[in-house]
Amino acid sequence: MKISEEEVRHVATLSKLAFSEEETSQFATTLTKIVDMVELLNEVDTEGVAITTTMADRKNVMRPDLAQAGTNREDLFKNVPEKENNFIKVPAILEDGGDA
């Protein structure tokens, strides 16, 4: 399945990324190769093959889920240069507000 440069540009726009024409072309080629490989893997007959979810022998190795007291909010806000309604106020990083 061929991934077109237009599709790459569309996804880049949605992701708020900017690519040169050369990069767009390279991404289209690379993504086409990846999709082709996945399609090839989909053709492999896995009938009768046991499902493998991990190669590790361990299962459900987790620490106990115990509640711990966190740092006091007032202490955290002592180092904050600017706050608003109990939130840390930071400079905007998207010019148009970030609407997709």
Curated annotation (Swiss-Prot):
Question: What EC numbers are recorded for this enzyme?
Answer: 6.3.5.-
* Xref: SUPFAM superfamilies: Glu-tRNAGln amidotransferase C subunit (SSF141000)
Chemical reaction(s) catalysed: L-glutamyl-tRNA(Gln) + L-glutamine + ATP + H2O = L-glutaminyl-tRNA(Gln) + L-glutamate + ADP + phosphate + H(+); L-aspartyl-tRNA(Asn) + L-glutamine + ATP + H2O = L-asparaginyl-tRNA(Asn) + L-glutamate + ADP + phosphate + 2 H(+)
List this protein's GO terms for biological process.
Answer: glutaminyl-tRNAGln biosynthesis via transamidation; regulation of translational fidelity; translation
Cystine pairings recorded for this chain? none
Carries keyword ATP-binding?
Answer: yes
One MF term in GO for this entry?
ATP binding
Q: Which UniProt keywords apply?
A: ATP-binding, Ligase, Nucleotide-binding, Protein biosynthesis
Q: What does this protein do?
A: Allows the formation of correctly charged Asn-tRNA(Asn) or Gln-tRNA(Gln) through the transamidation of misacylated Asp-tRNA(Asn) or Glu-tRNA(Gln) in organisms which lack either or both of asparaginyl-tRNA or glutaminyl-tRNA synthetases. The reaction takes place in the presence of glutamine and ATP through an activated phospho-Asp-tRNA(Asn) or phospho-Glu-tRNA(Gln).
The Swiss-Prot or TrEMBL record describes its family as follows: Belongs to the GatC family.
Q: How does it assemble?
A: Heterotrimer of A, B and C subunits.
State the protein's name: Aspartyl/glutamyl-tRNA(Asn/Gln) amidotransferase subunit C
Q: Which organism is it from?
A: Streptococcus uberis (strain ATCC BAA-854 / 0140J)
